[in-house]
Amino acid sequence: MAYADKCYVGKRVKLNLLDEGEVRQIHEATLDVIESVGVKFHSQKALDVLEANGATVDRESTVAKIPAAVVEKAMSTVPHEYVLGARNPEYDLPLDGEHIYISSDGCGVFARDPKTGEVRSSVKQDLADCAKVVQALDNVSATSAVVSAQDCPIETRVLHEFDACTRNSEKHNIVVSIKEDWEARSLLKMAEAMAGGRAELKKRPMFTAIICTVSPLHQERFGMDLALTLAEAGIPVSFYPMPILGATGPVTIAGSAVVNNAEFLSGAVLVQLAHPGAPVMHGGGPTAMYMNSGAYASNSPEALLLRSCQGHMADFYGVPAWYGAGATTAKEPGIQSAYENALAMFMAYANGADVTFGTGLLDGSRILCLENMLVDDEIIGMVKRILTGIEVSEETLAVDLIKKMGFNGNYLFDNHTRAHVRELWQARLGETGNYDGWKNAGARSTTEKAQEKVAEILAVPAAEFPADLGAEFDAIIAAAAREAAAV
């Protein structure tokens, strides 16, 4: 069985928070904004592409105003389905609307020791450890630069992060922090080495790039230049706006949804105009803040509703939806992180997310906590089962069985039960026994059990990494370091 089969939910249960008319209103408001106000593109390459295709460009202000007709033409070429490749093809992820995935999060700067609880600056080994945990979890489908490898040279840090993730996990990889041309070119060389060449990389892209926009209505130079480079190579790009209600976007959910959508749409249009058919995703991590303190409110009700709009807009444009879920503001694993992440993940997938980003961080995406990933893995398993819904058929109605059993029957040992019992979700981490049994077994908390499981995972060597590929990675990173030093 391919790994993706574990992530299949079919025509999932959806909440449908927005109706078709409301989705169209957000779309039309977005078109109004990007044509009348425009978007600031701090990239001359991007402005060249937009101007050549009918946008009105002011070079001094770097504002591009994009007519609705240009938007519609560009979005007509987006691919609706494609595959995210993995080092081991068994872990390839089809994006077809019938599977749901989560990756580890990014990009924190601290790591929490699972034994002592001590919080310190993150290093490359933390990414390796996180990748090993991702590999071991059934419900976490992709690894990422979850924290910064601060013990590596800044010029090649993103390459070291990709190296750590790839050597320790066979799953798809998420890249977030590319800022320079040599990083992009070097990363593509590493990905081509994994895939077996540029042509194979286009068929099975080895990584997805998350490109953060700057709210309100800015597209940074390095992000847009990177998007154009990666799109040409067939690498999926998820544009990732993060407007904050009442700060960098309107305080109303619908208003900030327009800002979020404008930043996604302007980036997607650019990519499609330059490279029609390049894979893009409707991404983002829009959020709120607590107005009485200014504190980040990543999983407030308003933030969850705002992010839910993205799934509806992605469906409207016919592109995969990739957005943030799981960035709890809790400072330690426990009750707060569990209820925040459970609600965030359910709301994301029930409103159309194909992939969420992600799990593994506390304190508003700053502190890596490996044991919290195991709790999230359990939550995602529950959410998947709920979204699969209820099958109603002659077999599942079981009328003949009910008649046979009557008033005194015991269904436990019937063939029908044996045939379907494995369909029932089973807890792996949560406590399901009786109180006395739990107490007599040491009264371990869920966090303690997760810590023990993390230790077990890290004690097992990662899957063998091909020596020739490792040598090629080392050579590419060394060459990038020399190129960076010469700039």
Regions found by a protein language model. Name each.
Residues M1, Y8-G10, L31-D32, V37-Q44, ...:
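Non-catalytic terminal accessory/regulatory regions of metabolic enzymes
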Residues A2-Y3, L17-E28, V37, H42-D48, ...:
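Catalytic-core signal marking the mid-to-C-terminal active-site face
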Residues K11-L15, N292-S298, G326-P333, G360-N372:
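Short beta-alpha connecting loops at secondary-structure transitions
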Residues E22-R24, L31, P94-T116, F316-T328:
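N-terminal small/glycine-rich loop or linker at the start of catalytic domains
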Residues K40-L47, E60-S61, S141, L201-K203, ...:
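Flexible, glycine/charged-enriched surface loops at secondary-structure junctions
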Residues K45-E118:
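Glycine-rich, N-terminal phosphate-binding loop and its surrounding beta-alpha-beta segment
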Residues S121-A350, D354:
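Helix-rich catalytic cores of soluble enzyme domains
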